[in-house]
Amino acid sequence: MEMRFSDDFLKALEFSRDEAVRTGWHNISPDHIMLGILRLDDSFVFDVLGCAGVPADGMKAALDDAVFVEEEVPWDERDSVVMSDGARSFLDHACLEARRCGSAVVEPLHFVLAACRVSGPYCHDYLDEHGVTLRSLVEAAGMKWEDYRLDRPAAEESPAPDPQLMADAIERRLREGYSTGIIPVS
């Protein structure tokens, strides 16, 4: 089986590297991926966040403030900026959220669902501080809570992607630019 990342999600991953460089980081964190998602034009995520009571512009400003450091990353070192272990773990969680939603394609929304579920990064804290729950996001996305497969492990339906294979494929795409977005899973 293959897990596929949508073109929008791959574009957000490319933006996440730019966000890491812009904010002075030498690696890409889950918050940089969220900032990359918030840079997408006309993304469904904006509608979902708005319905859940979170203005995307406010979230972007708060994340910028939280992750910005006064260290500059030279633009010529951009290609050496890689995913952190935390970002890789969040990508794995986004894959699981896609499966829980019944999708073989990982969309930016699935990352936002993962951010709501998994604590650690500032994006999770921001959603939590604004009273956003997993259920409110699922329903804001137009899904029925009863249809969301929270009660079953996502791996029941298909195997979880190998995190190292997935991370290697994403790193390669970040270096080469996104194309098909197909990630092999074991």
Predicted regions and their residues:
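Histone-fold recognition with a strong bias for associated Lys/Arg-rich disordered tails
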Residues: 1-186
